[in-house]
Amino acid sequence: MCPSIETLSGSPFVETIRIEKGRIHNLPYHNARMNRTRRELFGAREEIDLAGYIHPGPHQERTKCRVEYTREVLQVEYVPYRMRPVHSLRLVTCDEIDYSYKSTDRQCLNDLFAQRGGHDDILIIRDGLLTDTSICNVALWNGTSWITPARPLLCGTMRAYLLDKGLVQAGDIPVEDLPKYTRIRLFNALIGFGEIDEITRIYAVSYTHLRA
């Protein structure tokens, strides 16, 4: 069973931030999401700027900066990042999942990920619509534009950046419309747009669509 918002508020929340060549990527988007979570779940009115907590200078290779917080910042850690190759996805359905806040409690996502079988990751369907993989937002190419689901599980920071820059457009993608798209990209705060663009198959009972 997926945890409720009330249950999640008892777990720390997290921002995972890309550091590379001594630079913090998309920090304003991380600040905005963290402060929105603090305000909506903890009633915090004062805003926090993570620039005062993160020390990017020593990190030249791509690094995952992991900031755990509730009302206040709890801890900051740095881990070298290695991108996991993804070439195939398995469609899984869960209408009850709610991951609108980036919590450290990922049990529901982990349970769904365990259903991937021999495939690299999952693509989650909620209420008949495409949402996210276990760790990424997605965008699909319709021949003229990149469309990202309008109702993702989590509104990611890279997704927000791409929307602001006009590089993707938001729209509903019913699962039965998959044949209308020819490519799919996965992205998140650590994975740039276009870095995972070699997915050749999406698998389900009756879906084996998309081509590279």
Please provide the spans of the model-predicted regions:
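A cytosolic small-molecule/anion-sensing beta-strand core signal
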Residues: 126, 134, 142
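Conserved small/polar residues in nucleotide/adenosyl-binding loops
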Residues: 208-212
